[in-house]
């Protein structure tokens, strides 16, 4: 088991090295989109399932509270947190609509949807993207593997950050790092620091 544990660290490190080569430009573009969204008085909605739901909530918490610097709260909503709404929609309609119906109610032109799915094939996240597009929102998608069906929904103004891995755990680990990179870029662009390199 010790070797298996060490292998997990090694594979995680290698996936991050591969991601460091493949992803910086798309992360930078996504962060720039988010900055412009926030400067325009808009908000970021985030969704995902399981660990990706946790990532959506993590991102929202970093914006609403703070990441690493003291600054005013920034508008972000995780669509994964309201159990009454989620269970009502799931019960009365379908699980595939738990995010899309919220987006149709809350999303405005100029808002961004942060759509997170390791496979790119989560039905409710795909429906969320379709709803966001119908509301003239832009999309930042965090995916992995081959991008799945989500990759096919990306428009010219949208950004996909696709982790170069087929292993769900490794993709999730990089998604968290991507979220931290987005938060850091947003903070450092909107609120430059004297010690900024």
From Swiss-Prot:
This is Phosphoheptose isomerase. The lineage of its organism: Bacteria, Pseudomonadati, Pseudomonadota, Gammaproteobacteria, Alteromonadales. The gene is gmhA. It comes from the Bacteria. Pfam families: SIS_2 (PF13580). It comes from Shewanella loihica (strain ATCC BAA-1088 / PV-4). Zn(2+) binds at residues 58, 62, 172, 180. Its EC number is 5.3.1.28. Its main location: cytoplasm. Binds 1 zinc ion per subunit. Homotetramer. Pathway: Carbohydrate biosynthesis; D-glycero-D-manno-heptose 7-phosphate biosynthesis; D-glycero-alpha-D-manno-heptose 7-phosphate and D-glycero-beta-D-manno-heptose 7-phosphate from sedoheptulose 7-phosphate: step 1/1. The keyword Cytoplasm applies. The reaction produces a racemic mixture of D-glycero-alpha-D-manno-heptose 7-phosphate and D-glycero-beta-D-manno-heptose 7-phosphate. Substrate binds at residues 49-51, 62, 91-92, 117-119, 122, 172. Its cofactor is Zn(2+). Belongs to the SIS family. GmhA subfamily.
